[in-house]
Amino acid sequence: MHILIANDDGIFAPGIRALAEAAEAAGHRVTVFAPEAQRSAASHAITLNRALHARPVAYGGMRAFSVDGTPADCVRLGLYLLRDDLPDCVLTGVNNGANRGAATVYSGTVGSAMEGSLCGVPGVAVSLCSHLDRDYALAARMGVQVAEWAVANPLPRGEIFSLNVPFGPEVKGLRAATVSNEYIFSPMYAPEDGGYRMIEGRDLVPETDENSDLLVTEAGYAALSIIRWNLLADTPMPDLSELEAELMRK
């Protein structure tokens, strides 16, 4: 299987290197397209106002390119350049930190996997639920196995699998998970260098669903969720007749 690997932590981050090495060790062909620098929280942004450059880099014998763009740019450009040898899967991560709850909206790891799916290639995002544990081997191995399974069990275009792996030497198992309320918070800022740096604020919505990605991973299980790009809400639209009349009034 040919796997395109990307991330948002940058091409020389340990998580993506572990993921690429795990994919190669499993017998897959690997091509890496990743940002030249840290691009966390870039979400699904793409570059429209300038040229992008993909520069080959030494990567332990694997084919790898450093891109001066966003995580989604990396996948978008990578799939274009590989159009005659199209990957079977876009695998992103391993992210340094969880991508649970509302973090999925901000995540470049999730956004770049989604870009693959929108381009017709199955996408899998992999995240390690710790900023302290730097042993990515287990999460990388599990991510590759999920990618193999995802190719055999494809989702509709515009949907991806998002895997959050709890930190530590052991994982109790795998659970299907909903997207939690984590990271829905009132942001706070601290003064820094004449400006303001965002720090985590007060959570606004407590999580009670034991099947949520937050509580599943806190219980020691890996959480696998299906994420989609279509953000249309399930909430019924209120009657529009009065609003329409107001809008159309001359």
Predicted regions and their residues:
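Short, Asp-centered acidic motifs that coordinate Mg2+ and/or phosphate
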Residues: 89
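A cross-family phosphate/adenosyl-ligand binding-site feature
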Residues: 3, 13-81, 85-86
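Short beta-strand segments
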Residues: 6, 33-35, 92-95, 126-127, ...
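Glycine-rich phosphate/pyrophosphate-binding loops
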Residues: 117-139
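Glycine/threonine-rich flexible loop motifs
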Residues: 98-107
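Electrostatically charged, flexible surface regions
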Residues: 138-250
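Hydrophobic/aromatic ligand-binding patch that stacks against planar heteroaromatic rings
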Residues: 22, 112-117
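Short glycine-rich anion-binding loops that position phosphate/pyrophosphate groups of nucleotides
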Residues: 9, 38, 70-71, 95-98, ...
